[in-house]
């Protein structure tokens, strides 16, 4: 029989539910009065944000960074739309909802360009052209981009007949000159030391003594390098300072509220995760011990998969489903988990029972988290080519997480850290040795860490009331989902000439 909720668990449940409700109200309030109209620019998914009832508005085109999506830029889009701009935000090839992979020619040639850069610049120009043709658009387009998009937008601006103010966030582009872009805001997070220097270099092309937070001018050229306090490369997108700077640069004189949704997103996602802890106690108590593994055997299980997993990933799986690198990642995790499962099954035995209620709670909570993430923070639903990609990834992540769940069962913090670090170090080492084979998929490393932090916590709480087979199965599916939904897609072959 399920145990009754203790007072601490009941208190957590009440607080978590209140946090979720409050966050949802605030996040939807940030959208109130803003039209969000889906657009399709050829094969590019995009969204138009504008004030309800606005007849005419200046255009702003918003572009995300590598591995990002329109959702990651929505605080910016909502802020600018509320300030009176018509904002078009879009997903680059291979990212977000885009069904078209990027060119695999990501490494620069002798001229300093790459096939991927050429492809994304062309896509950006197509989006700008289509956005300018929308009814009610006035004036030249403003351009706003983050990280990777900063280089793409500067190159695109040089090819446009006219361009309005440009804002680059976490910029690294070396295409900025003392003359172009003419009106340029460069924003960085306080923790982005190197990129803050790049921002100052851009400002000092106009005034050698330019400082952060200072607007400098030379004729028609205007520059400003500004810093958002406390935040880094991702947090800068939700910083109120970033949002105010963008509003004031692109819509001067408009003292409209900014869409400071970052804390509410964290509260919503944190509330969903926290709710699993009290919910888990409602499960029937069917906990089963994991295999008895001493430190010596544990070390063998950590070291044995490293070399075969890395070598096989480097030499096989180059092109699967027409995508580059994806097969290698699935192979790495599958071999790693397969070796560990084989050793565990032979020497210790495996749990073989699946508890439907525990599995349903784990998958249901994970789905709820994914839906909230996808609506408010970042693209996190597998669509289009990412659906078969999830099935492929599951061939690797299921054995990996089944082995992981058996080894993590009743393990102390030291073993849990080692279980996370060993595959990360092996895969990271393989990427460093052969970046042209595995480097395009480096984003799986931070995704895996976030997966363990979020979904691993859910699995640990639910795992106290079930066995490792149930948790391994559930987390294996969720890890496949996470990789498939978030990994940038590169084609296995390119026909681009650049």
Predicted regions and their residues:
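Soluble extramembrane regions of membrane proteins in the secretory/endomembrane system
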Residues: 31-258
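An N-terminal hydrophobic leader/cap segment in hydrolases
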Residues: 2-40, 45-48
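Hydrophobic alpha-helical transmembrane segments
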Residues: 268-277, 335-336, 395-397
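Alpha-helical transmembrane segments and their helix-start/interface "positive-inside/aromatic belt" motifs
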Residues: 9-10, 261-263, 295-299, 351-358
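Alpha-helical transmembrane segments of integral membrane proteins
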Residues: 300-498
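Juxtamembrane interface at the cytosolic side of transmembrane helices
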Residues: 270-307
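Juxtamembrane/start-of-transmembrane alpha-helix segments at the extracytoplasmic/lumenal side
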Residues: 255-268
């Amino acid at each position: 029989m399920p145990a009754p909720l203790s007072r601490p668990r009941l208190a957590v449940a009440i607080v978590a539910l209140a946090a979720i409700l409050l966050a949802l109200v605030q996040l939807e309030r940030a959208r109130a009065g803003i039209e969000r109209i889906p657009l399709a620019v050829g094969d590019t998914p995009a969204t138009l944000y504008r004030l309800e009832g606005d007849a005419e508005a200046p255009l702003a085109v918003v572009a995300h960074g590598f591995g990002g999506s329109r959702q990651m830029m929505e605080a910016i889009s909502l802020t600018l739309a509320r300030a009176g701009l018509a904002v078009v935000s879009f997903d680059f090839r291979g990212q977000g909802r885009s069904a078209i992979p990027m060119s695999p020619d990501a490494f620069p040639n002798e001229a300093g360009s790459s096939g991927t850069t050429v492809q994304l610049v062309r896509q950006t120009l197509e989006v700008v052209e289509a956005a300018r043709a929308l009814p009610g658009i006035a004036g030249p387009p403003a351009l706003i981009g983050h990280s990777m998009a900063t280089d793409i937008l500067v190159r695109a601006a040089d090819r446009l007949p006219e361009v309005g103010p440009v804002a680059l966030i976490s910029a690294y582009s070396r295409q900025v000159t003392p003359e172009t872009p003419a009106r340029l805001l460069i924003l960085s997070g306080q923790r982005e030391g190197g990129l803050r220097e790049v921002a100052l270099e851009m400002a000092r092309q106009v005034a050698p003594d330019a400082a952060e937070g200072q607007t400098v001018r030379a004729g028609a050229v205007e520059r400003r390098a500004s810093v958002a306090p406390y935040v880094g490369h991702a947090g800068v997108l939700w910083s109120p300072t970033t949002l105010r700077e963008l509003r004031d640069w692109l819509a001067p004189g408009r003292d409209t509220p900014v869409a400071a949704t970052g804390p509410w997103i964290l509260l919503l996602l944190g509330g969903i995760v926290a709710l699993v802890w009290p919910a888990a106690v409602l499960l029937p108590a069917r906990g089963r011990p994991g295999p008895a593994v001493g430190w010596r055997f544990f070390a063998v299980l950590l070291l044995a998969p490293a070399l075969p997993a890395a070598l096989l990933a480097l030499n096989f799986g180059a092109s699967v489903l027409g995508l580059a690198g994806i097969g290698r990642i699935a192979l790495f995790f599958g071999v790693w988990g397969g070796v560990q499962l084989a050793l565990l099954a032979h020497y210790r035995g495996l749990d073989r029972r699946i508890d439907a209620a525990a599995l349903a709670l784990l998958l249901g909570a994970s789905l709820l988290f994914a839906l909230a993430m996808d609506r408010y923070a970042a693209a996190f639903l597998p669509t289009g080519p990412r659906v078969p990609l999830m099935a492929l990834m599951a061939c690797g992540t299921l054995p990996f997480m089944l082995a992981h769940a058996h080894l993590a069962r009743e393990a102390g913090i030291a073993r849990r850290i080692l279980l996370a670090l060993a595959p990360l170090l092996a895969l990271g080492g393989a990427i460093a040795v052969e970046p042209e084979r595995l480097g395009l998929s480096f984003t799986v490393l931070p995704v895996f860490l976030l997966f363990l932090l979020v979904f691993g916590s859910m699995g640990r709480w639910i795992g106290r009331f079930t066995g490792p087979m149930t948790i391994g199965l559930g987390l294996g599916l969720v890890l496949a989902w996470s990789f498939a939904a978030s990994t940038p897609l590169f084609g296995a072959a390119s026909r681009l000439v650049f």
